[in-house]
Amino acid sequence: NLNDPDTLQRHLDTRFQQLSTAVELELWQEAFRTAEDIHTLVGMSKRAPKGPVMASFYDKMAKVFAVGDNFLFHAAAYGKLYSLHSARLALQGGDAKGEDGELEKLASRVLLSALAVPVGSGVVETGRGRSASADGPTEEGESKGRLGRLASLIGLATPPTRAGLIHDALSRHALKRVSPQLRELYQ
């Protein structure tokens, strides 16, 4: 009975563990299906998962999207992960030891993944020249529906764009945290 909060929480815990295992074993389709299950269960839950659990989720989704050559959502997942880490660091009152180095690495991943999204790809292109609806009919409505599902899977209201991802990275001060070489690459 998923109406019982304890049962729902046990299902969520199981699915998060299943996602971790699927990524560890490189079972990418299973990982994606599990992520969809997690999204559905989180929507049913009255309480949101804790920050570290969601951070792990976004990290795993970044890996899943990278394997699928979905550069746009790979970058978006890293953006969500960076947002969680920087918010946690701000709540801790600034730069905690060891955390700043981790945030620098993550800022680099955010900026690089956003820059790696092909220019002019918009929201339809994903990677290897395929459209986002490569696994089905290429009608615009289905493509938008699939993009909307992918966006909601990682907690976005609308599908991301390359320009939007870069803007978000800059507005979250990722450029200040990356190495001078990466700053130069951006400029």
Across the structure, where does each feature detected by a protein language model lie?
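Extended alpha-helical scaffold regions
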Residues: 1-187
